[in-house]
Amino acid sequence: EDLCKSLDIPIIAGNCVTYEVAKRLMEAGVAGLMVGIGPGAACTSRGVLGIGVPQATAISDCSSARDDYFNESGKYIPIIGDGGIVTGGDICKCIACGADAVMIGSPIARATTAPGNGFHWGMATPSQILPRGTRIEVGSTGSLERILKGPALLDDGTHNLYGAIRTSMSTLGAKNIKEMQNVEIVIAPALLTEGKVYQKAQQLGMGK
């Protein structure tokens, strides 16, 4: 709270995964909130510390805190989903769970112009004593423009992220982010495998 009051710039805090912590940070005066502990491709926090909450649950709980805080104070604090986001579908699910925005690492690291040359280093906690990140090879799959805007060369949802969001929103009948945050969510693991026998056998699309 003292930090937020002492600085003339907006403070984005995180990362948190629970309703209680999210609400307290909002009451302390943060301008935005990062949500997610451990889901990142290069993050090892869950293994090193044994701490973490599934990302969909974390975003849902923290967005509930945002809505309650808004009703109480009139101040809207954006929720930023951070970690485990690889495909356009991942982004869409984060928004459906309540996120106002997302932060992505691996998709950007796969750009041919990324400085890692196909590697992604989890540096959220670069402690020399107890590091919680590792260096992983994600490969280089295309230009940053192709990854974000297409046209896609890959069929696994990692290219044309903007297009995925637009198409998902139109399919759901959502005109904006706020409407997409209110769509019905169904927990259905079978959606990833139902009817995908040939994709899985041939290592294509969702079968990779």
Residue positions per predicted region:
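Hydrophobic, small-residue-rich alpha-helical packing segments that form membrane-like cores
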Residues: E1-I11, Y19-M34
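Glycine-rich tight-turn/loop motif centered on a GG-T
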Residues: E1-P10, G38-T57
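Alpha/beta catalytic cores of nucleotide-metabolism and tRNA/nucleoside-modifying enzymes
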Residues: L7-D8, A28, G50-G81, V86-K208
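Glycine-rich beta-strand-to-loop/alpha-helix junction loops that act as flexible
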Residues: I12-N15, I37, G81-I85
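Short acidic loop-to-helix transition motifs that present clustered carboxylates
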Residues: C16-V21, V86-G88
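Generic structural signal for helix capping and beta-alpha/helix-loop junctions
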Residues: V21, A42, A111-T112
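Non-cysteine beta-strand/loop elements that form the S-adenosyl-L-methionine
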Residues: A31-P39, I104-G105
